[in-house]
Structure formats: C-alpha cells, structure tokens
Amino acid sequence: MATTVHLSSSSLFSQSRGRRDNSISSVKSLRKRTVLSLSSALTSQDAGHMIQPEGKSNDNNSAFDFKLYMIRKAESVNAALDVSVPLLKPLTIQEAVRYSLLAGGKRVRPLLCIAACELVGGDEATAMSAACAVEMIHTSSLIHDDLPCMDNADLRRGKPTNHKVYGEDMAVLAGDALLALAFEHMTVVSSGLVAPEKMIRAVVELARAIGTTGLVAGQMIDLASERLNPDKVGLEHLEFIHLHKTAALLEAAAVLGVIMGGGTEQEIEKLRKYARCIGLLFQVVDDILDVTKSTEELGKTAGKDVMAGKLTYPRLIGLEGSREVAEKLRREAEEQLLGFDPSKAAPLVALASYIACRHN
C-alpha cells in the first residue's frame, strides 16, 4: 500500500531553500579547491602552460594561457556537476555519489569534450551536458576500479576511496547510479540545444566506448593479464588494454564534443585519432609516474601496479623507452590538429603537452 506524505507549502519552501543554500555553499567550496589543486598541478609542470599558436607573434598577448583555460573550464564543469546531483533522499547514496564525483581532479575528459566542441565552432554551453556525462562515467569507472575485487585501492585523488568511506555495497551502487545518470543528464539537459539525430549518435558513441568493446573489455583484459610474464607479452597486448580501458572514454569525449558542435565527419575522425593518441599517452605517463613518484605526490597509492604484477610500459620497455613512446604519441596527437584554426586548436595542443608533462 502506498503511503501518502503531506507537506505544507512552507515546509516545501524550507527544504528547497535549504538545498539551494547547500548547493551554493558546495559550489563555492568546490571552486576554491579546484583553483588550488589545478594551480598547484599546473605550476609544477615544465610544459603546457603558455602555448604559442602558429602564425602568432611572440608576445604575452598572443600566447595561450592553458592554466587559466583549464581552471575556468574545471570551475564550469564542477558547478554543473554539483547541480546535477542534489542532496535528495535517500541521502546515503546521493552522498556517496557526490563524494567521488565532486572530489576534484583535473577534469581532463570534460575539458577535452568542451575544447573539441569549440574547435568546430560550438560553445561551452552546448557541450556541457556531454562533458558532465563523460565525467560521471569516468567517476563510475574509478569507483568500481578501486573495489577490492578489482584493484583494491585505498586512495583516490588524495582521499580514501569510495568503498573505504561508504562500504563496498554502497560504492557499487554509487558507480551504477552515475552510469545511469550520465545518459539521463546528457539527453535531458541537451533537449532543445542539440538535434535529436545528433543526440542519438552521441548516445551510441558513449555506450560503445564503455561496453564490451570499450572500457569494460580493457578492464577485463587488464585483470586477466596480472602476473603474466612480460617476456612473453608484446606491446600490442598492452596497447589493446589501454586503447580500451583509458583511450576509449577520452575518444568518446572528443567525438561527443565535435558531434555537439556540429562538426563534419572528417573533423570527427581527426579528433578521434587525436584522442586515441592522448589516451595512450595518458596511460604511458601514468605508468611512468607509478614507479617514479610517491603516494603523496600522486594522491593515490604509488607502486600498486608493480605490487599487483600488472603489465606496464616501464615493465615491458623500461623507463627511457616509455618516455620515448610518450613523446612520439604527443607529436602524433598534435599532427591531427593541423588544418584547424590555430587559436581554436591551442587548448588541445596544450592539453597534449600537459598530459605528457604532468606530475600526478
């Protein structure tokens, strides 16, 4: 039998006002954390800060300030994410979702989505729902990836992992909820902004990127590859893992941005190749950092891939070989941006350099 709950108009107003006040406070707090964390991360890097677009004079006014661009986009994304998950009942699952979704991070995937949309003539508002959807799915994958049955990680973004705070059962549900919310958010928020045929294509692209031919496939092969003898496994095997586990979602982020921005098929394919390169680049650098940085520097447990016996680039080709591969991938990514307006391509050129030179 259904239970009827009667609320007075004043009670409803009070609850609504409380949620609004909490949301405003949360956005302000999140904005402050974003500026501090991104400023720290970007200031410590040797490259990717000030990028000189092709054909521009070498002065401070024409140089592209990637640090400022990244902070501003992250602030916009964080504000949109905060609004997307209000504190409604049941509170526990909403809190678990918000704990990981609003934990900070570099927001590389939504930034890529927005920058790709802007590259082909779109704007931030048009891309934002897709950018948030990609970040929701990324966060979902991190929550599940950290579980004891997967990577069994204790730290993520400098904080205890979701299951350490809310328990394994709630972490599984939080990840599931984010996966569903991603598609709901993208389709509902974009209604009226994006043509239905474009939205259908975007949904298919995103679903394909995370299913059994995408992220899930990469995670499965990654788990199955633990303790394999690196002498008997080639780079092709490792590339398969990371093209699916890491690059697939980055690829989807870029392609969704171009779709939302009304790009051509040729532009979609160029950005797909660009994202594939930076996806592999991201993982090569991640493998390097895992064996060269401390837990404090990374914000997650250092050396856990080595301890788990996982296949990594340094394990297969050494640190120097891994660095050479990273530089090759960075150059190949930049080559895909030739022919675009240099000023609009500047954020993506800078993003490739940022990923190559990051320290955490």
Curated annotation (Swiss-Prot):
Uppermost EC category: transferase
Q: Where in the cell is it found?
A: Plastid, Chloroplast
**Cofactor note, please?**
Binds 2 Mg(2+) ions per subunit.
Q: Which residues bind isopentenyl diphosphate?
A: K106, R109, H138, R157
| EC number(s) reported in the record | 2.5.1.-, 2.5.1.1, 2.5.1.29, 2.5.1.10
- Give the protein's recorded name: Geranylgeranyl pyrophosphate synthase 9, chloroplastic
InterPro entries attached to this UniProt entry: Isoprenoid_synthase_dom_sf, Polyprenyl_synt, Polyprenyl_synt_CS, Prenyl_diphosphate_synthase
Query: What gene is this protein a product of?
Result: GGPPS9
Which NCBIfam families does the annotation name? FPPsyn
